[in-house]
């Protein structure tokens, strides 16, 4: 068939709008689409069962469990000290927040007092972790919407934070640096200069990110008015973190239920009004600026405090210092028994909640008086926030679903645990 004949044949075929199908008139058809679990936009092994009318989302059902590791059950077979390393593996983008929530709960059970130097160091490190986590969110969110430059810039600054974590703990992500009663070891001498260098450049880098996105017409087109939720629905669905604050609710545990002395720091709780993807973006960008401010205050406090204890002096909880272990057989025996048998909190339960980068993270521990927890449960913000996805997605295009997932910033290790 010649080109001319092919064109003539194609022109003779009626357009789809001219084809009548009487049997289907008035019948609404929908399609069920499986999105994931292996899909880059789901930010992990998340499967979404999406019902579509054309390209419009009628409903969506998250299907979770592909990354279940049984961390809560595994912790029941570990002593309280050894369980710290497992908390890193839930929200692997903010492991220090998980460490903090867990050790605060155990310290409540024990009635343990933590040295001021350790408390201030905890605040400084979790705020650096918040910035690092938000940088991953920003880079991947922008990449999902085809803004690749922001992804590269964000990971440039995140690398600097991970270098600080490596300097402090020897690990870049799974730090396991917080201990029941304080810190694993003291901050190194180089820590002050490394943090100061990062804080000096970070405000300007946030300006760069905002210059690329905030007034970008394509970014605005893909985010403004998409996935909006009001405060009443957000509260009913248990939404916390930037998602809740984007609806106008100034709920931040660092202010409303302060821990680690957050009530003594000066910072604002960023909020917005429309509750859409764009507002969630604005809230997180403002949060990074507030975290920089908190880090500056904490760094100055560390300078004012100077060298001092970084671990509780209660020998029933903390091992003897290494200087004693090398000189005293009794200290060596005590160290051995503490790490092999563990300490035994009194019977009871304790709950400790912190404001993680994704929202309200809580650890609930039940003690039966033994050296191992009877039950550990995490209130994971990613798990709770994910249930708001169907509410936000209905009526939007399937392409908007990609942006919606990114705006919730879920971590599947925390969802499935």
UniProtKB/Swiss-Prot annotation:
It catalyses: a quinone + NADH + 5 H(+)(in) = a quinol + NAD(+) + 4 H(+)(out). It is a peripheral membrane protein. One of its GO terms (molecular function) is quinone binding. InterPro entries: NADH_Q_OxRdtase_suD, NADH_UbQ_OxRdtase_49kDa_CS, NDH1_su_D/H, NiFe-Hase_large. GO terms for cellular component: plasma membrane. Its main location: membrane. This is NADH-quinone oxidoreductase subunit D 1. It comes from Roseiflexus castenholzii (strain DSM 13941 / HLO8). The lineage of its organism: Bacteria, Bacillati, Chloroflexota, Chloroflexia, Chloroflexales.
């Amino acid at each position: 068939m010649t080109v001319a004949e092919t064109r003539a044949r194609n022109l003779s075929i009626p357009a789809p709008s001219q084809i009548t199908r009487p049997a289907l008139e008035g019948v609404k058809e929908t399609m069920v689409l499986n999105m994931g679990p292996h899909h880059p936009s789901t930010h992990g092994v998340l499967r979404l069962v999406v019902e579509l009318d054309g390209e419009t989302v009628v409903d969506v059902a998250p299907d979770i469990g592909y990354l279940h590791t049984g961390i809560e059950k595994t912790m029941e077979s570990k002593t309280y000290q050894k369980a710290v390393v497992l908390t890193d593996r839930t929200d692997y983008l903010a492991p220090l927040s998980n460490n903090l929530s867990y050790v605060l709960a155990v310290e409540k059970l024990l009635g343990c007092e933590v040295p001021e130097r350790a408390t201030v160091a905890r605040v400084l490190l979790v705020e650096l972790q918040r910035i690092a986590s938000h940088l991953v969110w920003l880079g991947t969110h922008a990449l999902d919407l085809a803004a690749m430059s922001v992804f590269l810039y964000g990971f440039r600054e995140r690398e600097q934070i991970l270098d600080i974590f490596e300097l402090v703990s020897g690990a870049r992500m799974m730090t396991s640096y917080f201990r029941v009663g304080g810190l694993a070891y003291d901050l190194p001498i180089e820590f002050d200069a490394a943090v100061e260098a990062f804080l000096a450049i970070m405000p300007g880098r946030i300006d760069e990110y905002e210059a690329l996105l905030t007034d970008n017409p394509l970014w605005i087109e893909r985010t403004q008015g998409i996935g909006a939720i009001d405060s009443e629905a957000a509260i009913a669905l248990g939404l916390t973190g930037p998602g809740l604050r984007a609806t106008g609710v100034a709920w931040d545990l660092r202010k409303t239920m302060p821990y680690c002395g957050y009530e003594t720091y000066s910072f604002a709780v960023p909020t917005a009004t429309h509750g859409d993807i764009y507002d969630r973006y604005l809230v997180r960008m403002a949060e990074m600026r507030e975290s920089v401010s908190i880090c500056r205050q904490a760094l100055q406090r560390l300078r004012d405090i100077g060298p001092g204890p970084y671990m509780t002096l209660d020998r029933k909880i903390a091992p003897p210092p290494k200087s004693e272990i090398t000189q005293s057989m009794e200290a060596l025996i005590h160290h051995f028994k503490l790490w092999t048998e563990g300490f035994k909190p009194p019977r009871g339960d304790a709950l400790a909640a912190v404001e993680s980068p994704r929202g309200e993270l809580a650890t609930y521990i039940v003690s039966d008086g033994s050296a191992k927890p009877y039950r550990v449960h995490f209130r994971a913000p990613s798990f709770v926030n994910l249930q708001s996805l169907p509410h936000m997605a209905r009526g939007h295009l399937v392409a908007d679903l990609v942006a919606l997932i990114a705006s919730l910033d879920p971590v599947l290790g925390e969802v499935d645990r």
